[in-house]
Each structure stands twice: as structure tokens, then as C-alpha cells.
Amino acid sequence: MRIYLPATAAHLRAALATLGADNDQGEIYLTDVVARAHSQGLSASALVVSDHWLVEGCNDRAQLADLGAELNRRVLRRWMVEGVGVVDPSSTRVDVTVELARDVELEPGALLRGRTRVGEGARVGAYSILTGVDIPAGAVVAPFSLLDGDAPARGV
């Protein structure tokens, strides 16, 4: 896949500032940047992108879901290569901001968000939701737990 862009970042920034959505689809087209450069006598060059996901468009919620699933697949793969166990990658979600130590086990349906950190050998139970918490090494988070370190403390 190739993307054509003006030769300099300054030209790209200037062209991006002029883009509009005055077309039948009401969308902004990056190709208009190349047309603008051409009309001004500027050169454009091709950037070869081997991974189409890095430049994939998103026009509706179905495409947004596809992009999110691909990002999550990559995040989980990275952690599994680092020694994290993921019982069911298709149902497990981990934000890019989460930090996992070696030998962490994530059971099906686990959702880890924000600045969550999970220590070595800890186990996160099925369908647990962790947001902005530190789980110590060797700890066991029970299934269906809801731990939110970002939530304000509430009085009883």
C-alpha cells in the first residue's frame, strides 16, 4: 500500500488545515492534500506502508470495532510473547497503557484499563474489570471483581 504526501511536513500541515468535507459523502479526503500540492507545483512522494492497519480508514462503528479488535489482538500478542497467559484472547481486553509482569494469567472476559499494573504471577479472574489499580505479585483477583482505582472514594 502506498500513501502519497507532499514533500515536506510544512506543506502537509498547511494542506491539512485547508481540507474540507464538501463532497457527497461529507468526508475529509487525504488525497486532497496531494491535489493541493500538485496545483501549487509542489512535489509529492510515496510512502510505502506494509501494514495496512496503520493507515486503515474508519467511517462507521463497524469499522471502528474492527480497528479496536486488531489493536487488542496486537496488545495481547505482545504480552503473550512476554510470558503473560491469556486463556481466551477473543474475550480479553487490555489497554495499551496497562503493564503486565511475567507469568500473569488473564482468565476469559478480563478487562484491564487505564494505568493498571499487574505483578508477576498474579491471576485475574474471569470477567473482572480492573481500572487504574496495582495488583501485587502473586495476588488472585476473584472472578467478576470490579476494581477501580480511578473512582473517587465514597463514604458509607
Regions found by a protein language model. Name each.
Residues 1-72, 77:
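Catalytic-core segments of class I nucleotidyltransferases/pyrophosphorylases
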Residues 7-11, 41-44, 83-84, 95-97, ...:
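Short amphipathic alpha-helical segments, especially helix-boundary/capping motifs
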Residues 14-17, 47, 79-80, 84-87, ...:
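General secondary-structure edge motif
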Residues 27, 49, 79-82, 137, ...:
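Residue-level detector of alpha-helical recognition elements and their boundaries
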Residues 54-59, 92-98:
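Short, solvent-exposed polar/charged micro-motifs at secondary-structure junctions
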Residues 68-96:
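Long, charged amphipathic helices and adjacent flexible linkers at domain junctions
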Residues 84-86, 90-92, 98, 102-106, ...:
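A structural motif detector for beta-strand N-caps
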